Swiss-Prot record:
Record's keyword terms, sorted: Ribonucleoprotein, Ribosomal protein, RNA-binding
Protein's name according to its UniProt entry: Large ribosomal subunit protein uL30
Entry-linked InterPro entries: Ribo_uL30_ferredoxin-like_sf, Ribosomal_uL30, Ribosomal_uL30_CS, Ribosomal_uL30_euk, Ribosomal_uL30_euk_arc, Ribosomal_uL30_ferredoxin-like, Ribosomal_uL30_N_euk
Stated family: Belongs to the universal ribosomal protein uL30 family.
Length: 252
């Protein structure tokens, strides 16, 4: 007698996935892949920039050391020959406003506006030439200024540096703040580039200094004591030459 035929249960059909859902899933996967590629590319660019910035910083440091050694050598040579060593004329000044606007002459007010010194204890870097030296003389009773060294320039930018972005005052928190504004047109992509351009008064000094927001400094310990007197007479205003660096130690 033949064995009874056992019917196999029909396989359950999976519900069909709507075409719209399949398209959406495919789109999401494509988005994730694109985002992943974008992140990898960005990480590679950041790594490259970091490497470039380290190379630049090292190059600048060597340049500063060589310049200092050359200066020392020239001083020693002059001393050996019983001569006076005359250093090169300063190209860079740092200017600080020390007085308010009461009874300010229109010419003085205009100079202070051009220098962007709108408040007491505001400071800016200025390229020294015939025009700016004349402007400094006009505004002299309201400002003090001098020749900043590398340490002062660095401390000002690293500790007190703010830049202009979309008309806003933005702190220098990383190199990207500088790169997005100055890299393409002016080859300045990191803080050390900015320090170098300012300190050496490079070809892009105008753009670098205008990019920096005027520095807001502390009042020096004890305050401004003799604003009405020139620095050479024991007062506060006027050219301090290299002694501006001592003042900046108290204000940064």
């Amino acid at each position: 007698m033949p064995a009874p035929v056992v019917k196999k249960p029909a396989a359950k059909k999976l519900p069909a996935v709507p075409e719209s859902k399949l398209k959406f899933s495919k789109k999401q996967i494509s988005k994730r892949v694109a985002e992943s590629k974008r992140r990898l590319k960005k990480a590679a660019v950041i790594a490259l920039r970091k490497k470039e910035n380290l190379v630049r910083a090292e190059k600048y440091q060597n340049e500063y050391i060589k310049a200092e050694q050359r200066e020392i050598k020239l001083r020693r040579l002059a001393k050996k020959r019983n001569q006076f060593y005359v250093p090169a004329e300063a190209k860079l000044a740092f200017v600080v406003r020390i007085r308010g606007i009461n009874k300010v002459a229109p010419k003085v007010r205009k100079v202070l506006q051009l220098f962007r010194l709108r408040q007491i204890n505001n400071g800016v870097f200025i390229k020294l030439n015939k025009a700016t030296i004349n402007m400094l003389r006009i505004a002299e009773p309201y400002i003090t200024w001098g020749y900043p060294n590398l340490k002062s320039v660095r401390e000002l930018i690293y500790k007190r540096g703010f830049v202009k972005h979309n008309r806003q005052r933005v702190p220098i928190t990383d190199n990207f703040v500088i790169e997005r504004k100055l890299r393409q047109a002016h080859q300045i992509q990191c803080v050390e580039d900015l320090v170098h351009e300012i300190f050496t008064v490079g070809p892009n000094f105008k753009y670098a200094s205008n990019f920096l927001w005027p520095f807001k400094l502390n009042t020096p310990t004890g305050g401004w004591r003799k604003k009405a007197n020139h620095y050479v007479n024991g007062g506060d205003f006027g050219n301090r030459e290299d002694q501006i660096n001592r003042l900046l130690r108290k204000m940064v």
